[in-house]
UniProtKB/Swiss-Prot annotation:
Keyword Phosphoprotein: no
Family, per entry: Belongs to the influenza viruses PA-X family.
Protein name, UniProt field: Protein PA-X
Gene3D superfamilies, sorted: Influenza RNA-dependent RNA polymerase subunit PA, endonuclease domain (3.40.91.90)
Residues the record marks as active site: E80, D108
Chief site of localization: host cell
């Protein structure tokens, strides 16, 4: 699964997922299903916001070219993928500026057009079950919830899907592709049933003998893409076209 993640997702997304897991003391090399799930969630959040802008009349528009968009305001603020301190700083800033109620939990996005925070969910189970779990956890009518599944289903608060049909179809197609790629490598079943995967992992670890003399040096280099992304997120004039270029699936 780890090899699949590094092949299928952009290095920027992989590094953000690794950083998030390490922040909570989790190891991407061991909890590989979670690693894949976090990468998938990050990519959906990026795709959700791509190409969506607000014009001078405060109308939502979709533009896919680069330079002409520099003066347009991005419709969505991406909160997911930041470290917790920076994420809460962004949330507090939005609340102070817009007057919206501060959420109890960190949301994934903020929609400047609808003036609401958005919680994105990607599930391997039934969408309505996952939606209810999210709603029960958040316990706030102010945060909008939008759930996607790998089977093409979706569910949103009050059936308000926020995005146009084409944008949502793009996300669903990507999720279906990820599922197909996992299935072709024999990874889908364990991804759907994490408990079985954990049992198999424990069994595999017990069967391994300590190996002496193996290289243990780990590279801590930061990818140029990540260095570009961090200041870009803080720049209100960043372009969706540049950010979208990071999201192409890299295949062998």
């Amino acid at each position: 699964m780890e090899d699949f993640v590094r092949q299928c997702f952009n290095p920027m997304i992989v590094e953000l997922a690794e950083k998030a897991m390490k922040e909570y003391g989790e190891d991407p090399k061991i909890e590989t299903n979670k690693f894949a799930a976090i990468c998938t969630h990050l990519e959906v959040c990026f795709m959700y916001s791509d190409f969506h802008f607000i014009d001078e009349r405060s109308e939502s528009i979709i533009v896919e070219s680069g330079d002409p968009n520099a003066l347009l305001k991005h419709r969505f603020e991406i909160i997911e993928g930041r470290d917790r301190t920076m994420a809460w700083t962004v949330v507090n800033s939005i609340c102070n500026t817009t007057g919206v109620e501060k959420p109890k939990f960190l949301p994934d996005l903020y929609d400047y057009k609808e003036n609401r925070f958005i919680e994105i969910g990607v599930t391997r189970r039934e969408v309505h079950i996952y939606y209810l779990e999210k709603a029960n956890k958040i316990k706030s009518e102010k945060t909008h919830i939008h759930i996607f599944s790998f089977t093409g289903e979706e569910m949103a608060t009050k059936a308000d899907y926020t995005l146009d049909e084409e944008s949502r179809a793009r996300i669903k197609t990507r999720l279906f592709t990820i599922r197909q790629e996992m299935a072709s490598r024999g990874l889908w079943d364990s991804f759907v049933n994490p408990r079985e995967a954990k049992r198999q992992l424990k069994k595999d670890l017990k069967s391994l003998e300590p190996c002496a003399g193996l290289p243990t040096k780990v590279s801590h280099r930061t990818s140029p893409a990540l260095k570009t992304l961090e200041p870009m997120w803080m720049d209100s004039n960043r372009t969706a076209a540049l950010r979208a270029s990071f999201l192409k699936c890299q295949k062998k």
